[in-house]
Structures are given as C-alpha cells and as structure tokens.
Amino acid sequence: MRFNPKPIRIEPAFDHPGKIRTMFERCAPYRALATYAPEGIKDEAHEQAMRPVDPWFRGDWALGGEPLVDGADLILHNKRFLEAAKDAFGTSCVNPEFVAVNINGPMPACTTHVDNPSFYGATRVDYPLPFLRVMGGSGLFEAWRVVRASTLSWFYEGAGGSFDYWPEGLDGPMRSEQSPFGNVALCSDNDQMYHRIGTIGNGTEEMPRISASAKIQPDGEGNWIILENGEIRATYPRHAIRFSVLWKAEVRNGNPGVDHLTLDRIMEIFTADLRHRGIDFQVPSDPLTDTPWILLLQRVHANPTDSGGKQ
C-alpha cells in the first residue's frame, strides 16, 4: 500500500450533485467547528487560539460506517470515491467510515494543517478530537494509525474559497482547487498531506462576533443566518456560503496486524514517554476530558504548523 498517495481528481464527483446540495438545507442547523475543540482544550501558547471564532460550521452525516441523515448513503457508498481510493492507495480493501460537512461564511484563510487521525481502538466515535490530535502529534502511536483515504468535494461559486494543498510536503509546491468548483472531488491522504482553505470572499467582509455556541441555518428566504443566544449575528446570501463534503474511508491490505488500543494502553505509553523526558505530571482520573492533562500533552508534542485538523 502507498502511504503518501498522489491525489486523484474525480470528475464528475456525483451522479446527481443537486441532491447532495439540497441536503445542506434539509440537515441544518450546524454547530460551530469550535465546539469540536473547546477553548479550554486549545493550546493557549498558540497564536491561533487567540483568534476570534471563525464562521466555520460542521455537521456529521455518517459515522462508524452508518448514515446519520437521509441521503448520506449516496455519499458514503459513492462508487467513484471508492474506486479512486483503491487506485490511490493500491488496495482493494476500502471501508467507508464517515461523512462530515463544512459550512463556511466569508473568512480569512485557515492555518495549514492535517486532519484529525484515527487509530485502531481509538477513533472519533469514542475519543474527543483534541485527544486524538495529540496522539497523532506525539508520534507514539504510529503502529496503530489507521490509514485513511480522504475525499473532498465542494459546492461554491463565489470569490476565493480555494482548497490549497501540498502533495509533496510543505517544502514542495502548493496546488489548488478553485471556485467555481463544479462537480469535482479530490481523493488524497489528508491525515498526512498538509492543506488549508483559502480566504473565502473578497477579504473585506466584516467578521461576525460569535462564540463556539453559534449555529448556522437557512432562513427560508434564500439566505443563511448565524444564530447565537436567539440573536441573528450575521446574514449571508446563499452564494456567499462555501459548502464542502468530507468523505473518509479506512484503506488497508488484510489484517492490520496490531492489537487495538485501549485507554489504559494509551495512558501507559503517554506516561512512560513523559517519565523518559523527565517531566513531572499527575495521572488524571479522566484523561479524555482533563484539560490540564491535554494541555500538557499539547505543549510536549506541539506542532507549530498544525492548528488542529479542521478539514
């Protein structure tokens, strides 16, 4: 299997893209992406943590290989996505895992990053994303890392909003998919390949004052509105909103050959590493939600380029 595959462009991405497009309205509202990484579990030493909350919202349409909303099976079992993943990774074993969607208002370019990892025995089904990110950044769990195909498709014809990526690493040239996107998708390994969203809009739009509790939804009149505490914080025409679909699938040849991780095993590995480094710490009673513990791991295993796997 090739672990750093060359991205494959898929066109057309969907037989009926209009059906996918209408799902965004039907499945609203969507929560702010910031709710996936609450402020108290961000690395406060990073400049990124000091930025206001961007108008970036997310929803889950499929999880654990099962659709969560009507119509998600059209994406989860998309034959073109499956065939591209087989070709890119050189395997016949592709198991769709989840479908997530991103809804973005006008905003600055996001920080270059890689996506949130998964491990055998530790996935987003049972583990919070900040904990999975620090597992990935530590390099201590590579033997258990799930190799995944990532396929992104977009619904946006406005200004900016590019998908920028570095298939040869950050020292190599940047490539971009640009608006108007049309019925296309890109299959790659976004858990390993650095990428970002470019500036959405013309760069002069005023950012709404929102927190992680904000939501976005259509207003029934052709616009999308951001709501928080019962107040409308921003209103956008539909054409100003960038919609994208993220499909993930495990790819492998046969049995991965490793026992699945347990939380006890993960903690054994983390604590042994901290002792080896000579770092004082207290073992938390609930390591998945203990903020000081996760912040300690973030500081020890900080990656100055990666802002937290937002795609």
What residue spans do the PLM features occupy?
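Extracellular structured ligand-interaction cores
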Residues: 5-7, 96-98, 146-152, 160, ...
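Catalytic core of Fe(II)/2-oxoglutarate
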Residues: 158-311
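Charged, glycine/proline-rich intrinsically disordered loops and linkers
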Residues: 37-54, 119-137, 200-233
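A structural signal for short, well-ordered beta-strand segments and their strand-loop junctions
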Residues: 9-10, 32-35, 93-102, 162-165, ...
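A general structural signal for short secondary-structure junctions and capping/turn motifs
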Residues: 1, 90-93, 141-145, 155, ...
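Signature of the catalytic double-stranded beta-helix
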Residues: 53-128, 132-144
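Generic N-terminal leader segments that precede the first folded domain
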Residues: 1-62
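Glycine- and acidic-residue-rich phosphate-binding/metal-coordinating active-site segment common to enzymes
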Residues: 114-184
